């Protein structure tokens, strides 16, 4: 079956048989439709009921690379099959057998940094300079009515601009939507182009396109966390203060998102590293701009309560 879907360890994999026949029996099967089906349909099911191995593991085997390369890219949760395949194809033969974290991170960053023309920073400063900003992340707390009311109250009290990240909530009107994840972007619909702010790794029409690499965090585990990237952009654009909603932190036992189709399998160690990384990054960013939480969060520190 495709992706070996089945109970426990799953079944033998269609895509592996196809690749084997192409290499050894002179067959000319196209694997791309199968892999796209995995990416778009079967992989989301796998995230809630895991079995067998992963798509990234298949690519690691295909390119005969150390499995930790696959794990590194998979844990990013930002790449489509096409993007991951493109990165694997650039791994040099002499680098494939032994895992080099710094090397794969450079390939990943180079892939994500590629893009077209960027919006002048002056244009963004005109939007945000001197303004309070409420950031709406897709954390599970934003599905709770009492938590939503806190957000409404904060927006009204501070006359804040509202920016959602990697999603477009229906329960509140957002002035802008900031997207850094191509997988999330592909699931969005009905957003006015002039309200869309994207990072340069996304090749799409938008009101504003900002450089990906300049917004990266210095903490490895959360280098390209979307909320941290947006805060960095707001600092560069002269915003006055930032309030966070739906930035809940990560749990490896419970749901993390307001939307089930956003759920990913969270390894306990990865979740801990992300939580500590985001907390540390917010503490650093708070030295340059006031940052506080509106909704409940595992990341919340006493001094950052709103």
Which positions does each model-derived feature cover?
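Metal-ion/cofactor- or nucleotide/acyl-coenzyme-handling active-site neighborhoods
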Residues: 115-306
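Catalytic cores and adjacent flexible loops of soluble metabolic enzymes
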Residues: 1-120
